[in-house]
């Protein structure tokens, strides 16, 4: 799968992906959830959030709560990396 910013989903071996929009975050969450064969309801339970939150997140809603996003990422075995975009990788 190709993300809107040109990143490719590498079948689960991804180490870093640069995401710039809520829609890209949602696409990544949906892709990873499906790769793990987890329903939205199960993921919501694992992350202690509602299924509506998972749906909103996967659909790119831009006003989600950061802690809930972190909880969902953690439930999927993912994390968030912040970097200075003006420095070289």
Language model regions located:
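Short, contiguous strand/loop micro-motifs
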Residues: 16-17, 27, 56-57
């Amino acid at each position: 799968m190709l993300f809107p910013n040109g990143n490719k989903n590498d079948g689960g071996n991804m180490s870093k992906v640069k995401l710039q929009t809520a829609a890209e975050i949602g696409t990544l969450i949906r892709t990873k959830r499906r790769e793990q064969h987890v329903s939205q309801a199960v993921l919501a339970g694992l992350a202690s959030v509602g299924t509506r939150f998972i749906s909103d997140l996967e659909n790119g809603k831009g006003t989600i709560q950061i802690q809930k996003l972190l909880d969902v990422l953690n439930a999927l075995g993912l994390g968030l990396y912040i970097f200075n975009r003006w420095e070289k990788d």
